[in-house]
C-alpha cells in the first residue's frame, strides 16, 4: 500500500478513536447544567433541631448540635466529601441528573415525558428507570415540596405540582422552582425550637443540606434573600433583631400568613416523612401539633358562628322588607 494512503488511514483511525473517546466521555459526564452539584446531598442528611426533646431527637437519623465557626467549616468539608461519595454511585448520580432535568423542564414550562427522561438522562441505565424516577420524585417532594405526577399514562407525560395549597412562585419569580420546601424546613426548625429560633441556628441546619447564606443555590438562588426578605415580605416569616444584642443578632418566628395557612401538623408530617417515620414518633411535638389543630378548629367554629350571626339580621331585614312590599 502506498505510503500516502497508509498515512491517511492512520489519520482516519486516530480521528475515529478520538470521536469514540469523546462520545464515551460525553456519556459518562453530564452537561453544564446536569452536573452533580455540591448542594445535592442526600435528603436523609437533613438534621434535627438542638432544642428538640432528647427522646425525640434520637429518633431522627442524624443528630444536630450547635457548632463554632471552625467546626462549621470542618462540617462543611465533611459534607462536601460525603456528597461527592454519594454522587459517585451511578444510580445516585442519575437521580441528581433527573432532579435537575425535571427542574429545568419546570422552569421552561415544557412537557415532561418518559421518552425524554430516558433519552437525555437515564440513557444506558434504562433497567433502573423506575428506581431512579421514584428516588428523584422523593427527593423533589422532601427537599423542595414538589410532587411529580403522571398526568397522561398513555403517553407517559408528567407534571410537577406544589404540595402546599398556596404556591410560592412569587418568592423567586415565575421562572424559578417554588421554594415551599425551603419554607417548610425553616418553619419546622422554628417549631422545634419553641416557635422562635436564631438566624445562626437556621443556617447551621440549612448548611447540612448544602444551603448556605453566602452561596448561590442551584434551586433557591440567593437563599439569604429568599428567607430574610422575600418570605418576610410575603408574611410567611418574621425576622427581627434580638433586643440588646451586640453585635446585632436576629431571630425568626412564624409570620401571620404561615400561622393562617400552614398547620404545625402539616410541618410535623413533612419532617416525619423526611425521616421515614410518623408524626406521633415525636410525642412532645405531636402534642403541640394536636393542640394547634384544636385551636384552629375552634377558631373556624367561632368564625362560622360570627358569620351566621351577621347574616341573621340581614335575613330578617330582607323578610320584613318583602312583607311590607307585599302589603
Swiss-Prot record:
Keyword presence, Cytoplasm: yes
Tissue specificity comment: Expressed in testis, stomach, large intestine, small intestine, spleen, lymph node, bone marrow lymphocytes and blood T-lymphocytes. Not detected in brain, heart, lung, liver or kidney (at protein level).
Localization in the cell: Cytoplasm
Domain of life: Eukaryota
GO terms under cellular component: cytoplasm
Domain MAGE: from-to ranges: 91-289
Cited PANTHER family: MELANOMA-ASSOCIATED ANTIGEN B18, MELANOMA-ASSOCIATED ANTIGEN MAGE ANTIGEN
UniProt protein name: Melanoma-associated antigen B18
Gene source species: Mus musculus
Amino acid at each position: 500500500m502506498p505510503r500516502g494512503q497508509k498515512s491517511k488511514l492512520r489519520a482516519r483511525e486516530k480521528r475515529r478513536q478520538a470521536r469514540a473517546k469523546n462520545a464515551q466521555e460525553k456519556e459518562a459526564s453530564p452537561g453544564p447544567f446536569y452536573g452533580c452539584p455540591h448542594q445535592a446531598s442526600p435528603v436523609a442528611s437533613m438534621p434535627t433541631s438542638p432544642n428538640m426533646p432528647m427522646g425525640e431527637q434520637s429518633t431522627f437519623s442524624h443528630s444536630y448540635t450547635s457548632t463554632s465557626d471552625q467546626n462549621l467549616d470542618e462540617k462543611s468539608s465533611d459534607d462536601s466529601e460525603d456528597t461527592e461519595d454519594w454522587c459517585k454511585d451511578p444510580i445516585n448520580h442519575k437521580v441528581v441528573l433527573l432532579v435537575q432535568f425535571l427542574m429545568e423542564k419546570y422552569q421552561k414550562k415544557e412537557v415532561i415525558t418518559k421518552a425524554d427522561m430516558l433519552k437525555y438522562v437515564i440513557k444506558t441505565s434504562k433497567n433502573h428507570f423506575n428506581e431512579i424516577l421514584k428516588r428523584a420524585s422523593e427527593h423533589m417532594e422532601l427537599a423542595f415540596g414538589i410532587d411529580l405526577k403522571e398526568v397522561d399514562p398513555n403517553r407517559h407525560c408528567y407534571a410537577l405540582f406544589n404540595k402546599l395549597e398556596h404556591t410560592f412562585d412569587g418568592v423567586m419569580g415565575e421562572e424559578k422552582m417554588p421554594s415551599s420546601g425551603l419554607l417548610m424546613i425553616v418553619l419546622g426548625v422554628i417549631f422545634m425550637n419553641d416557635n422562635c429560633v436564631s438566624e445562626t441556628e437556621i443556617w447551621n441546619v440549612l448548611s447540612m443540606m448544602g444551603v448556605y447564606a453566602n452561596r448561590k443555590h442551584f434551586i433557591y438562588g440567593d437563599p439569604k434573600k429568599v428567607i430574610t426578605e422575600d418570605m418576610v415580605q410575603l408574611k410567611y416569616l418574621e425576622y427581627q433583631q434580638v433586643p440588646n444584642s451586640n453585635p446585632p443578632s436576629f431571630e425568626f418566628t412564624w409570620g401571620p400568613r404561615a400561622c393562617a395557612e400552614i398547620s404545625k401538623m402539616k410541618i410535623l408530617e413533612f419532617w416525619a416523612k423526611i425521616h421515614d417515620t410518623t408524626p406521633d414518633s415525636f410525642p412532645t411535638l405531636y402534642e403541640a401539633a394536636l393542640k394547634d389543630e384544636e385551636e384552629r378548629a375552634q377558631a373556624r367554629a367561632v368564625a362560622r358562628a360570627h358569620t351566621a350571626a351577621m347574616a341573621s339580621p340581614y335575613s330578617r331585614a330582607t323578610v320584613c322588607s318583602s312583607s311590607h312590599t307585599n302589603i
